[in-house]
Amino acid sequence: MEIRGSSQTAAAWAGEAIALGFFESETVLTVPENLTALDERLSGVIAEVIAETEFKGKSGKLSVTRLGSGAPIKKLLLVGLGNAEKWNSAVLRSTAAAIARAVKGDKAITTLGLQLPVAETEAITAQMVTEGMYLGFYEDNRFKSEQKDPPALEAVEILGIGDQPAAIALGTSLCEGVIYARELVNAPANIINPVTLAASVESLASTYGLELNILEEADCEAAGMGSFLGVAAASDLPPKFIHLVYKPLGTPRKKVAIVGKGLTFDSGGYNIKPSGPSIAMMKMDMGGAAATFGAAKAIAELKPDVEVHFISAATENMISGRGMRPGDILTASNGKTIEVNNTDAEGRLTLADALVYAEKLGVEAIVDIATLTGACVIALGDDICGLWSDNDDLAQAIATASEKAGEKFWQMPLEEKYFEGLKSPIADMKNTGPREGGSITAALFLKEFVENTPWAHLDIAGPAWSEKDADIYSKGGTGFPVRTLVHWVLS
């Protein structure tokens, strides 16, 4: 599917289908001035459809009408935009996704014109439509025996905004990164495991000319990564510590690290998860790694002047005679000792060594991403990501990037008093604290493994997965927060 901006008006456009946006009206809508010429060209059909369907432009309402065989346009889509005062780039993106869903199963539509109000600027409008169309179209059918035919739609023309190649390229790259992340998360643990995840990243590195260093188990032992290897001990599959690097041409403006939790399956270990959805969903526990490498794909395409290190300590958390037990003591690569009082709080153990490794690279900021705690979902629900940071400037930069991305974040406290709950009588700390404030104590645990570098922790346990098709998301992995990470790097 090709998306392009155009200076052409709706009145002059010709193709299979055209989508026209209308703001909500409490009274009967009339054809706006900018569409009267098109309505005349279509013999008044726009006004007729509005009257016959009592279309009032309510948000989420979409009317599709097939026109006569002699009409210059074959299908007319009237799209409700809701309250004009609430129109913004996020609403535009959602609107484009709704249009994509409305037309993707229609084999008669190969060309689509979009006449929608500008949101902020013409460039932002082009980017938002691009994101909405690509993500609204996306379905992951890789594992079905009968494949659906691809959508017939070949070209989308955004009318009245002029040529916007840079904005459309940005939106396209963001979507490709999101979709890569979604497919990693959606793949079950017999498809994506530490070995195949590393192979996928190796292919990514080869495609984009990125540097790649994969530390094998012996390398991790030599580096003293006892925390990571404690989690990996029970699995029959070898752990893979993945370090992917994007370097710009010339001197980089900045050097940062993105660290993603990479548990390709989490049984809970000896603190085994209960049967049912809790354990069945644990293929998604590498959502942080998926977002990390999805961001890498987009950044490699966009080529910013920032050096970025993408890191994930990838393993499974399984059960065997070799596995870590409740009460075991692990030693992380910074020398700190950890009493394991819950084998199902394993993600932070893998992140501990990954954060130590990242800081040794001499980066100016570290952001970790993890499906870390159910406590964060209890606090913020499944739409909002928890953000913790020891640096106000970094926290603000991520918040600003999230606004550009349209992904929801909420900054949470790093309450030092709560570290009391992590204290151990026999080690430097335990890996879990009391039930209360569980997402905060998890962040405080991670903070112990970053000494002097600005650091932020993103708990994506809620928004990493969607239970239904909604907005730009399809059921399954969401690719959250690839777009925020990319906007942060670009800024």
Swiss-Prot record:
GO terms for cellular component: cytoplasm. The keyword Manganese applies. Belongs to the peptidase M17 family. Its EC number is 3.4.11.1, 3.4.11.10. Presumably involved in the processing and regular turnover of intracellular proteins. Catalyzes the removal of unsubstituted N-terminal amino acids from various peptides. The active site is at K273, R348. GO terms for molecular function: manganese ion binding; metalloaminopeptidase activity. It holds the Pfam family Peptidase_M17_N. It is found in: Cytoplasm. Binds 2 manganese ions per subunit. The gene is pepA. This is Probable cytosol aminopeptidase. Signal peptide: none annotated. Disulfide bonds: none annotated. Mn(2+) 1 binds at D266, D344, E346. It comes from Picosynechococcus sp. (strain ATCC 27264 / PCC 7002 / PR-6) (Agmenellum quadruplicatum).
